[in-house]
Amino acid sequence: MPGLAYHAAMSITLSTATYKLAAHLPRQLPADSGREVAFAGRSNAGKSSALNAMCNQHRLAKTSKTPGRTQQLVYFEVQPERYLVDLPGYGYAKVPMDLKAHWQAFINGWLQERQALVGLVIVMDIRHPLREFDLKMHDYAHARALPAHCLLTKADKLGRGAAGNTLLAVRRDLGVRGTVQLFSSETKQGIDEARAVVTNWLQL
């Protein structure tokens, strides 16, 4: 069936993703060319698990029980000049204020100026959606006219009716600032839909 072949092709495409580099300084970034899709979300929102599920790899992005463990921009190369970028979780780990300020300045500058950035995937725990930093990420995308797609992760933690109601509420509140879907790394709900968005942005 054509539809099944299409989904399989998308899975294979993202499953080629491999670790490229981690950067905590501008000079460590790859050349600002090609196409990059960033993944952002609160600590413990399930961002690393979502990346792993979408790429059909268990250990591509490291998951941690410690909030804010990802402290750098982590680049995964899907194809030459086609990257998935894992941003530090907001609500950073307990670190010195000067280090936290450095991260914030670095990430803010990257979001505002990176020309290769073509889309932002914003990962939110469905039980705690649209917190302050989630809205700030949507504002970054909207200010740059970048598409934003929201994953309401851990959808399996709510009943079907409650999950559907949350989806409708978030969709209403976001308005034109982004699209939104249900997602679960555990049950695989929404993985094909999320892959389709990302592969389209990367022009794969």
Labelled PLM ranges:
Residues H24, R69, R82, G89-Y92, ...:
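Conserved nucleotide-binding/hydrolysis micro-motifs of P-loop NTPases
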